[in-house]
């Protein structure tokens, strides 16, 4: 008998999470056999595990969007009177599309 407990499911690796994200972009909600395709793309996870992972992701997004998850207090990084945003802006100027 399968359990819905998170502890009975093996942890997701960084690579599996990335493959999951990519598969969600490829197989949208209208794709036939979406969860089978996503599970196959991820590898090492069942259709049920993939669905549960998606449900947790949606739940997390809802909690963030409704303000139930507090934003971290980021410290301003300054070096030579330039903030991190200045650094990012300089990097973006060299970006070629």
Swiss-Prot record:
PANTHER family: MYB FAMILY TRANSCRIPTION FACTOR-RELATED, PROTEIN RADIALIS-LIKE 6
Miscellaneous comment in the UniProt entry for this protein: Assigned as a member of the MYB-related gene family, I-box-binding-like subfamily.
Name of protein: Protein RADIALIS-like 6
Keyword Transcription regulation: yes
Role: Probable transcription factor.
Pfam family, one: Myb_DNA-binding
Cellular localization per UniProt: Nucleus
UniProt source species: Arabidopsis thaliana
GO cellular component: nucleus
Gene designation: RL6
Reported tissue expression: Expressed in the micropylar endosperm surrounding globular-stage embryos but no expression was detected elsewhere, including floral tissues.
